[in-house]
């Protein structure tokens, strides 16, 4: 049997659900961010009665749950309401033009025609938004250039001066200094309803990783002492994501060796203390 056949034919696994450890996985239960999620939903709620929503500005370091809260809120809204939602990831849609093309794609369920100017796309978007309520989530806006961020913020927040729109904006920022580097108009707009995401505590990281392990790994694959060690390491480097990646890598490693549980020596290779 070739190595390929051996690997592909094996059904041995230590995982119940590998997807749970993916960085883009949205859990059914949001841990340690209930208050923030509730605030976002409260701000959006007026849209259900066709009233003006409160815009939300989510501020916190990387790996503090902002994206998870946004995506969880969007999922709930899509499941329980008829509101249109548009998620923009400024790591990918990293220019003003790309942001408007993403909004257009969601609103019209098709790609914009090639060759159209950003101004024409923006005009089409604004006209469409006059017809329906919409939630626009702009994640990591600090990845836009300052000029593009200034324009996007001003255009969307000031749109009611020229268009009869009923939209809710959710913006995340992981670098607070970026906010103060913008033009005064954009800065004043961002002084809206700020929702703070403090760094996770050691206990919160442990709780989140424990929940993921219970849902994603088979019983006895990792013990509490090992999980606490990974949690301490993740807390020290301020990265919950690192803990999730590490558990996934450890699981895949022992699975490839047909072992049923993680040993302390396995963790020694990745955790320096």
Predicted regions and their residues:
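Alpha-helix termini
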Residues: 46-51, 77-80, 159-164
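Residue-level recognition of the N-termini of beta-strands and the immediately preceding loop/turn
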Residues: 53-56, 83-86, 133-134, 166-169
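Basic, amphipathic DNA-recognition helix from helix-turn-helix-like DNA-binding domains
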Residues: 273
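Mid-core helix/loop region of P-loop NTP-binding domains shared across ATPases and GTPases
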Residues: 5-16, 22, 70, 91-208, ...
């Amino acid at each position: 049997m070739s190595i390929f056949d051996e690997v592909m034919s094996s059904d041995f696994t230590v995982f119940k659900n590998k997807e749970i450890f993916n960085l883009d996985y949205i859990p059914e239960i949001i841990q340690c961010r209930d208050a923030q999620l509730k605030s976002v939903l409260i701000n959006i709620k007026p849209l259900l009665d066709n009233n003006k929503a409160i815009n939300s500005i989510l501020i916190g370091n990387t790996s503090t749950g902002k994206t998870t809260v946004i995506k969880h809120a969007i999922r709930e809204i899509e499941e329980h309401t008829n509101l249109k939602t548009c998620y923009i990831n400024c790591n990918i849609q990293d220019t003003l033009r790309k942001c408007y093309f993403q909004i257009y794609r969601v609103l019209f369920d098709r790609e914009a025609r090639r060759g159209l100017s950003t101004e024409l796309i923006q005009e089409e978007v604004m006209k469409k938004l006059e017809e329906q309520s919409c939630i626009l989530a702009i994640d990591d806006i600090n990845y836009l250039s300052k000029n593009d961020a200034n324009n996007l913020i001003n255009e969307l927040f000031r749109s009611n001066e020229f268009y009869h729109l009923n939209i809710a904006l959710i913006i995340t920022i992981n670098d607070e200094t970026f906010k103060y580097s913008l033009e005064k108009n954009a800065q004043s707009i961002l002084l809206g309803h700020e929702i703070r995401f403090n760094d996770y505590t050691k206990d919160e990281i442990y709780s989140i990783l424990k929940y993921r392990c219970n849902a994603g790994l088979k019983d006895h694959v990792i013990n509490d002492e090992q999980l606490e060690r990974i949690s301490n390491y993740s807390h020290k480097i301020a990265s919950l994501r690192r803990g999730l990646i590490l558990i996934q890598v450890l699981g895949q490693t022992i699975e490839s060796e047909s072992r049923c549980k993680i040993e302390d020596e396995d963790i020694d290779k990745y955790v320096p203390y």
